[in-house]
Amino acid sequence: MARSKLLKADVLSVNCPSRQILDHISSTWGSLILVVLLERTFRFSELRNKIEGISEKMLAQTLQTLEQDGFVLRKAYPVIPPKVEYSLTPMGKSVAKHMQELTLWIEKNLAQITENQKKSSKKTKQN
């Protein structure tokens, strides 16, 4: 039996596949989908309604990417009309918890961050 060659991950390396995965989970839509799916299993239309501003095309693309990475499980039922549900895999739950911590940190510190942005914007306009 052949042993699979383990990749040495280096997210700082431009050629490392880990960088692409980082992009998938840390993109706006990827991170929001992961955080929402921590709540429960959702149907496509429920996700679209829950995540304001996401287009159907972007939702479908992002779900497909997260499924290919092994973070999201897509379950299609053989019924009419079609019924498809999305949930997190164990690995998806693991990474989603980290993304949730990040989103909670952002919400907690939003006032300070926006104040910093205003100060920086004023400095730029004065120069």
Question: What do these predicted regions represent?
Answer:
Residues R48, A76, M99:
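Short, flexible helix/strand-to-coil boundary loops that buttress conserved ligand/catalytic motifs
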Residues E39, I80, S94:
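Glycine-/small-residue-rich active-site loops that bind phosphorylated ligands and cofactors
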Residues E67-S87:
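Beta-hairpin "wing" of winged helix-turn-helix
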Residues M1-V14, Q68, L73, P90, ...:
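C-terminal regulatory/oligomerization modules of transcriptional regulators
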Residues L59, L63-L66:
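Basic amphipathic alpha-helical segments that dock to polyanions
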Residues L12-M58, E85:
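N-terminal helix-turn-helix DNA-binding core of bacterial DNA-binding proteins
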